[in-house]
Design a protein with these regions (language model features):
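Substrate-recognition element of Asp-dependent hydrolases with the DxDx(T/V) motif
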Residues: 101-144
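Asp-based phosphoryl-transfer active-site loop
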Residues: 9-29
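Short, Lys/Arg-enriched N-terminal segments with co-localized hydrophobic residues
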Residues: 1-2
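Metal-dependent phosphoesterase signature
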Residues: 65-110
Length: 171
């Protein structure tokens, strides 16, 4: 068999999208979202200490960094842009407050919404896979300059399915 026969292209059924640099500028995450979470995280930890998401994230932080105070470890992770589930969950909670209070609005690239709508109309399944939590992904697409575009997506995947560089995450 020739190389051409072995690499026949099939029509795609799913478009799996990342967020940063794909549907909105990387700068939005690094210059808006991350600083917002860093500023608001201490108050969130104090005010929502009984929130199950906070309790679980702090327990996971303690498991990943035994003997290090949680707030200190979270700061370290933010300093290094670590892709760890407990930090992402807590950042997501901070952002949820910001979006709901109108302090945060995602500005997607101009071609994103028309393209997503065209793909959806063509019968493609649209999904997101990002290191940001599933909840954070839904907030980004739920509070955009173009309105709520979450109905265009069929699925949202985060680090709970595995790392983006691990092939098993895509199975």
């Amino acid at each position: 068999t020739t190389m051409t026969q072995n690499t026949a292209l099939t029509t795609p059924r799913v478009v799996l999208l990342d967020i940063e640099g794909t549907t909105l500028p990387v700068a939005f995450v690094h210059k808006v979202l991350f600083p917002y979470a860093r500023t608001h995280l201490p108050a969130l930890l104090a005010q929502q200490s009984d929130n199950p998401v906070v309790v679980q994230a702090l327990a996971e932080t303690a498991q990943l960094a035994p003997g290090v105070p949680a707030a200190e470890q979270l700061e370290r992770w933010m300093d290094t842009d670590a892709k760890v589930a407990p930090l992402k969950s807590l950042q997501g909670l901070c952002w949820e407050q910001g979006y709901r209070q109108g302090e945060l609005v995602a500005d997607l690239y101009a071609d994103v919404v028309p393209t997503l709508k065209a793909w959806k109309a063509a019968g493609l399944t649209l999904a997101v896979y990002s290191s940001g939590s599933e909840a954070a992904q839904k907030l980004i697409y739920g509070y955009t300059e173009q309105g709520d575009v979450t109905p265009l997506f069929s699925a949202f995947f985060d680090l709970k399915v595995g790392g983006k560089r691990e092939s098993a995450s895509y199975r």
